[in-house]
Amino acid sequence: YIGPTFQQAKDIMWNMLKELLHGTDLIETTHENTATMKLVNGRRISLKGSDRPDTLRGVGLAYVVLDEYASMKVEVWEQIIRPTLADVQGGALFIGTPAGKNHFYDLYLAAEKDEDWESFQYTSTDNPLIDPKEVEVARRTMSTQAFRQEFEASFVSFTGGIFKNEWIKYDDEEPEDGNFVIAVDPAGYESVE
């Protein structure tokens, strides 16, 4: 399991792993400092951080979870993890919140077209554990782009501008001849596709 940093990986997954495996006969040893478990079948479960990519080299892997992949450097997958999985034809699961149209977006699109891969998209708005009222409060108080990215798992080009799209009003009728003032928002830029 790889998170953006070792501490994040440990904070997110370590206690959950210990709870899931507690009381089973699967664990041979547990090492708190390195967040590693050795299983009775000889396999290891280790938590790592992608912020120190060289610590990921030289370790045999059968399966890896890359959490918050959009926050990782693409080289972590392409130059370190992917080659390491090759000798055992290992697998990988990429999870996280989109962060614009970066390498996570590219991988998501490629996986939709490749029969050896699968793409999934789950939104917070569909999560039964999140109160719909909280979702509506977030929708009202966040920018459209931030809400779409954080709650709807949309690959939006988030610019962090201060104006919500729905606040902008316009008229379909062309104006008459005359002098006009045009306001420009220098707070952000979003590409139009």
Model-derived features: positions:
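Conserved RecA-like ASCE P-loop NTPase motor core of nucleic-acid helicases/translocases
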Residues: 1-9, 122
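Catalytic acidic motif of RecA-like/P-loop NTPases
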Residues: 7, 70-71
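Loop/turn-to-beta-strand initiation segments
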Residues: 44, 61-63, 88-94
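ATPase catalytic-site recognition across NTP-hydrolyzing enzymes
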Residues: 127-187
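Short, flexible loop/turn motifs enriched in small residues
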Residues: 189-193
